[in-house]
Swiss-Prot record:
Residues 1-21 are annotated as: Disordered. This is Mediator of RNA polymerase II transcription subunit 8. Component of the Mediator complex. GO terms for biological process: regulation of transcription by RNA polymerase II. Residues 30-59 form a coiled coil. It holds the Pfam family Med8. It is found in: Nucleus. InterPro entries: Mediatior_Med8_fun/met. Component of the Mediator complex, a coactivator involved in the regulated transcription of nearly all RNA polymerase II-dependent genes. Mediator functions as a bridge to convey information from gene-specific regulatory proteins to the basal RNA polymerase II transcription machinery. Mediator is recruited to promoters by direct interactions with regulatory proteins and serves as a scaffold for the assembly of a functional preinitiation complex with RNA polymerase II and the general transcription factors. Belongs to the Mediator complex subunit 8 family. The keyword Chloroplast does not apply. The gene is MED8. The keyword Coiled coil applies. One of its GO terms (molecular function) is RNA polymerase II cis-regulatory region sequence-specific DNA binding.
Amino acid sequence: MSQTPFNPNSPSVPTTTSLPSTDFSQIPYDVLESIRNRLNQIRQSLTKLADQINNHNRHPQKIKLPSYSYFQNQFQVLITQLMSITNQLYNNEDLLRNTNVYPTPIFPTSAHENMLTTLLRKKVAPEVDEWINGAKLIMENETKNKLDNQQVEIDILKIDQWVQWCLAKIQDLRDEFQFYGFHTVEELDHMETPQGKQEIKEKKDKEFEREQIELKITAGGQKSLHPNQVLKFMCQGQI
């Protein structure tokens, strides 16, 4: 019995179909990889910071929190990382919005199923959605505060204008009067009477006694300023 030689091109034998080559020339690998690395750095920094705080909360007597300067440096690093990834996302916004992600035939779906479902997710995760809404709320509050501050500036400007008007009005009223000393016309007329002269003499005697007492108790025997001198200095800048 003769045997038919094995023919690999026979239709009954399955052949391996070669996959078409995929063109990745339009994909900015460097930018996407940089974003991924930045996200990984932020995740590691936050994880380390959270572990330090949680360990201290669980064992406050055994594990102490780092110094304030350490936390300040860590926050500065996080801010720098967030600013960097924000700029990269902003510069590649069109690319990230318009790029359709799909697995190639050689993608290891079994080993990286979670990654695949994450990449193909059309709706953001609940925690991300909450973070975005919180950021929008903060921006709305800041905008409202700016408007309120502008209104406050307008109110302050009106107050300044009102103060200027008051000063001008006081100056106009002051120009209509003549001020000599600290007594009214009625008081000056009373001081010319015998009773008024007697009151002035008694007042001067009391002031002299008070000045003598002050000279004994003040440092260096210096004479204190009279209240009228203080008022004159406050009003006219003269002693």
